[in-house]
Amino acid sequence: MKTLTVSLLSALCLAAPAWAGQGTPADSVRHLQGVEVTARLRQEQGINPLGVPAKKLPLTISSLADSTLSLRAITQVKDALRFVPAVQMKSSFGAFREISVRGFYNTVYMVDGVRDERSTLNSYPLGDLYNVDQIEVLKGPASVLYGYAATGGVVNVTRRVPTEKFILGAHVRGGSLGYFDLGANVGGKITDGLHFYAGGFLSGGKQWRSTNDKNRSLFASLSYTKGIHNLILRLEGRNDFYGTDAGLAPVMEDDMYRVSDDKLYLKKGELLPGLKREWRYNDASDFMYNRAYNGSLKYTLSLPSGWK
């Protein structure tokens, strides 16, 4: 080990003068003018109103992103909320939806951070999710941040915002009982600072109990950014049809016996003779349309971080 050490030191001593004797290479450093790199972070209004990372707040928030909805082919709110813990949804008369969060049916429903005041009654039709970026659910006492009628929680749906990335998509899907849905969307950059997005969706089919429900929607969004100013215009229209359903007649709450001979007539949970679960229990002339048209214009002024 001692010999090896001496050899290495000798080699270094011999190499140093040889390197020093060589000519100094020409300076290849070029001085450039100052280069400024900037980026813009645009954050849409979510269910967290404080602007602080959720992991640092005592809030219980569950979210489903667009990638999750697309992967599971989810286009309806009732299907999306099945993947959120402590949230349930039930339907009445085929068209009306009731959302329960942690057992409470007082739930606020919002679109792009704006309350849908129909949620005061918590029984109303809901549109499709084809043009949605994400769904967020705020559970527990923190729901008081959104005012009255929010005992259970808050559901916020964020619709798509145009970006400069070009997108072009379409899909066609079919299922049992005659179900089908199809959609198409396109978006991208028009010019510097000006972006657009547009999408349409249609679903229908005979479906369970022959209700022939249909969802039809069109959505368009335009975004313009110049410096610290940003404008987002959203326009949406939908025309949904529901073949309302009163539901099954009550089943037997207990075993039923004949009075004449005291023999078992119907068991607990059975339907009355002649009724079928797949029938639609309503009049053919009883139906419902959900027509809705809305628009919004949002202006955002982004102040520099050093502004006081």
Regions found by a protein language model. Give the residues of each.
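N-terminal Sec signal peptide and the immediately downstream disordered periplasmic leader
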Residues: 1-72, 82-84
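Short, charged/polar, Gly/Pro-enriched secondary-structure boundary elements
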Residues: 32, 106-110, 162-167
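Extracytoplasmic beta-strand/coil segments of soluble accessory domains associated
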Residues: 40, 44-54, 58-61, 78-115, ...
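Solvent-exposed coil/turn segments that connect beta secondary-structure elements
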Residues: 40-42, 66-67, 86, 104-106, ...
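Transmembrane beta-barrel architecture of outer-membrane proteins
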Residues: 72, 76, 96, 119, ...
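Short acidic/polar hinge/loop motifs at secondary-structure boundaries
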Residues: 89, 98, 114-139, 158-160
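A beta-strand signature from Gram-negative outer-membrane beta-barrel systems
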Residues: 129-171
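Transmembrane beta-barrel wall of Gram-negative outer-membrane proteins
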Residues: 167-169, 174-204, 209-267, 272-275, ...
